[in-house]
């Protein structure tokens, strides 16, 4: 697989994992829509030292429970596998019996690397949105600080060794089971034709051997039948010779 395709697979896999975890997080966020909103309307308003900070409380044990469920791992593996299919990375799957093994390897990779520690580190703090709206004339807002501590999960995953091991392992799995496409599409076609041709040649050899076998059996039976006829004919000839001798 080329470097560009590997990078795309790595990036897409990371996005799928982060989106899947985020979907589980939404079920565990105690305040689904957290937002700080400050509106300044009218004229001549003066605001000093405005500070906004927002954190959504999140039960990490809830997220860990959902992430460790078998359904989550299976669904995540299905999403990754489908994504790889959409990229035509697994182009040879119609010829390759290893599709099931590939999917199993991906699932095992997720189980090993997506640990509760990684999940807890990436979802322990989640922030919403800070909004400051000023409308009107002559309004002054000084020393306004907006602290947004929203942790983008994909960034957390990309910086995590465990997540890197996950995506790297999946990429290696794809490389292993998609060795045809790692060379060249036309090489894949040539290999496919060669494989079919070899199967045809094997079938032809088998047919020839069967025909030769039939000929050998036929020749053996025919020779045996002819030998039996000759043995039956010998007494008749002897009797005829004796009769002729007696008449003489």
UniProtKB/Swiss-Prot annotation:
> What are the record keywords, sorted?
Capsid inner membrane protein, Fusion of virus membrane with host cell membrane, Fusion of virus membrane with host membrane, Host membrane, Lipoprotein, Membrane, Myristate, Signal-anchor, Transmembrane, Transmembrane helix, Viral penetration into host cytoplasm, Virion, Virus entry into host cell
Predominantly, its location class is host cell
Q: Which domain of life is it from?
A: Viruses
- According to Swiss-Prot or TrEMBL, what is its membrane topology? Single-pass type II membrane protein
Q: Which Pfam families does the UniProt entry name for this protein? A: L1R_F9L
Q: Which purpose does this protein serve, as stated in its record?
A: Essential for viral fusion with host endosomal membrane and core release.
Query: In its UniProt entry, what is this protein called?
Result: Inner membrane protein pE248R
């Amino acid at each position: 697989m080329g470097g560009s395709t590997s990078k795309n697979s790595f990036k897409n896999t990371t996005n799928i994992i982060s989106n899947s975890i985020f979907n589980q997080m939404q079920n565990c966020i105690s305040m689904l829509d957290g937002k700080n909103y400050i509106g300044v309307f009218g004229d001549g308003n003066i605001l000093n030292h405005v500070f906004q900070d927002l954190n959504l409380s999140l039960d990490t044990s809830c997220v860990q429970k959902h992430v460790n469920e078998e359904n989550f791992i299976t669904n995540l593996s299905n999403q990754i596998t489908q994504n790889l299919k959409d990229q035509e990375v697994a182009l040879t799957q119609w010829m390759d019996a290893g599709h099931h093994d590939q999917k199993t390897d991906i699932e095992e990779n997720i189980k090993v690397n997506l640990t509760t520690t990684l999940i807890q580190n990436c979802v322990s703090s989640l922030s919403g949105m800070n909004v400051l709206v000023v409308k009107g004339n002559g309004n002054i807002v000084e020393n306004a600080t907006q602290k947004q501590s929203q942790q983008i999960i994909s960034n957390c995953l990309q910086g995590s060794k465990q997540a890197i091991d996950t995506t790297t392992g999946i990429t290696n799995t794809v490389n292993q089971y998609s060795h045809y496409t790692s060379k060249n599409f036309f090489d894949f076609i040539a290999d496919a034709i060669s494989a079919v041709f070899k199967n045809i040649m094997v079938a032809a050899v088998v047919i020839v051997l069967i025909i030769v076998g039939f000929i050998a059996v036929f020749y053996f039976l025919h020779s045996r039948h002819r030998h039996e006829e000759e043995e039956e004919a010998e007494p008749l000839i002897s009797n005829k010779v004796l009769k002729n001798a007696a008449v003489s």
